[in-house]
Amino acid sequence: MTTTVDLVPGLITTRDAIAAAYGCGTFQGIEPADEAGKVFVYSDPFAGEEYGYTFDGRAEDDEFGPLYLYTGAGPNGDQKPSGRNGSLLSHAEKNREVHLFVAHGKVPGSGAMQQRYIGQMVLDPVKPYDIRRGPGRDGVMRNVLVFRFRPAEGTTPAWTEADQTPAAAKTTIEVTDPAVAVPAPVVLPQQSGAKVKKTEQHNTSETIADIPAGQRKVLRREGELVRAFAAHLAAAGHKTHSFQITIAGEPGVLTPDLYDATDHVLYEAKGLTTRANVRMAIGQLADYRRHIPGRKELRVAVLLPSKPTVDVKDLLGEEYVELVYQTDHGFVGWPLAYT
């Protein structure tokens, strides 16, 4: 290492400068620097647009705070949680920091790309990545890993409006496998080595939320519920999948939990049987169904881990939403009654 680079959010630098300072490579989007104990991530949303997908960028803040999405490594074929992608997933257990850069135009008088340093990140501890469908460099659709970054504690990210996830150019619907596997949670590492400005915990626009372990358990319970019900349907000879829906003019994608192609039923699962969760599921199904082929004949159902109250059952009935819930002996409410 022949130079030093102070990692201050907002810094404009180059891959070569980072490589010279920390001993990493310069050509890949994910560049581990083993001796320095860091993993450098270079995001370029416009590179994704070249191949027909726009996953990279700052997503809408959720109840846990800011969120940045980043498409994993692998130009063709299904991306795997190994290799360079694995270096992100294992960064906490190996005590490596993750540092995010975004492409920032060309170096004046040169073809080299400038990089703007956003700040130190951690993988979302509830859901480290989503699996999305997108074309490879060869034009063939495949599964891609979309990592979910949160600002590390104490980091004030150097976001700009240009970092927002690009809006989809058109409305599309892509058949996908059901999202039944929940990635293993990632332990949040302690921050060190990056120069950052400490933010107040109540500055919701710029600070990472304290994500409770309970939320992680609910998400895992939801994934296990979908997996069990998909297996139940398969044993009955039913074909299942899900959808990835993009909406023209909007960033991100819609991803219903499970579609029973045999009975033309769309299911939305919840990990807790509460009124709030059921109301959320009703709204999600109302949104999803507008984009599903054969929407007039489509039936929708809520999948729950236990029996809801009588009034919640009545709510579902008034909204013409079917109910299926799990018991020790299987699933009550399935097969659905034909009406």
Locate the predicted segments by residue.
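Interdomain/boundary linker segments immediately adjacent to catalytic/signaling cores
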Residues: 158-217
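Nucleic-acid nuclease catalytic cores
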Residues: 102, 108-112, 271-274, 290-325
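Active-site-adjacent loop/helix micro-motif of nuclease/hydrolase catalytic cores
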Residues: 273-284
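Compact mixed alphabeta submodule
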Residues: 110-181
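Conserved catalytic cores of phosphodiester-cleaving nucleases, focusing on short active-site segments
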Residues: 229, 258-273
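Acidic-basic catalytic patches of nuclease active cores, encompassing PD-(D/E)XK
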Residues: 195-245
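Charged, structured surface patches that assemble and position nucleic-acid processing machinery
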Residues: 322-332, 336-339
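Acidic, glycine-rich low-complexity segments with interspersed aromatic residues
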Residues: 2-115
